[in-house]
């Protein structure tokens, strides 16, 4: 394997370095967001490599054209999101680039696996990082892959939004169907094996009360609200489980569809003044037609990167974050780092290494807050966050590596005591605890069918994505043992 991790402190510098490395080769450049994809592609354009963009908001025609021209080219780079991680054949490939780091070992292996397929060629990935934390994440992913560790696929047994989808699909298939027949067909599916019949019937009752389902003569059919929400274009929304936000088609004067933008971004655009990036090119807004949701555009010399909504935090796994902790605590030299990455790693080790080496809780204090370095991953940290906020009244900000705790009297001993409270026997098993945590969850939109669920089931779905109660309990037990 040929691996290289480099550090560049801005997206333009990152794009410049990638363009130099791409020269004369066929490369795929993976980015973690559509916005960064557009910015990097625009910065790479004009630097002697033919650059294309590939993500879900670029039109199908543009994506197919990029794939075809990439097949034929020799000095080409497609800047893309995970749309090119699997399945799509773009032919022989020389290099894979990664902006910052992917969120999982499996993604890294899939992306690197696009190279090294020709005789005599070596599989390779070059990481172009913007921050020291991205360097740390890239190292940890590489080292876990070297150890032949990869994430397991968790089995879900209470998939409420899919249950709603299947219920509506059955009414569409049969016209009218009894709840008993629906249950007999669905309860055998592994994704629903954790749902009891009484819970299923409660869901059906809610869907009837909200007019998503209509019952007559003991048979269920689609309610008027379901037809309004999901019935457009011959129930197209029921044939696609994934959510699509309200989109505006971006079209040139010649009728070419460039791609699509979300309404939230379009609402901030001004005719004859605003410009934006899409498909790696800059476009000026000529006219916005709200009635048919079309944005009429012409070429522009420059533009701003678009924003796409639906923010949901990128949650890293516990094993990956623990590997990041180990990288900081050890003195291992990684030969695939450039000089800037080596210096950034040395700085992070100097900052956190002594704290981690002491054992016990890794807490840093400043004038206004305490930082608890858990390296426990996003789900465990968010679980700890909501438990601490509920029991102490403090404000807690969680990411994958740490909790920032703000409030009156936040000191080392009080943080230890608060953790002792939520580590107490029976705390996590108490139904009041679980209700309190679920009540604090943000209203993340994870599925188009979420709106049809009762509140408790919708909160459970968000909680399953964001929380890990067993993991939090395990981390607290281990932390208590280290503090003895």
Feature map (PLM): residue ranges:
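Helicase motor core with emphasis on the C-terminal RecA-like subdomain
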Residues: 1-174, 178-225
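C-terminal accessory/connector segments of nucleic-acid motor ATPases
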Residues: 149-271, 275-282, 287-288, 364-375, ...
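C-terminal accessory regions
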Residues: 342-410
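A generic structural motif
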Residues: 55-56, 153-157, 220-221, 293-298, 394-415, 429-434
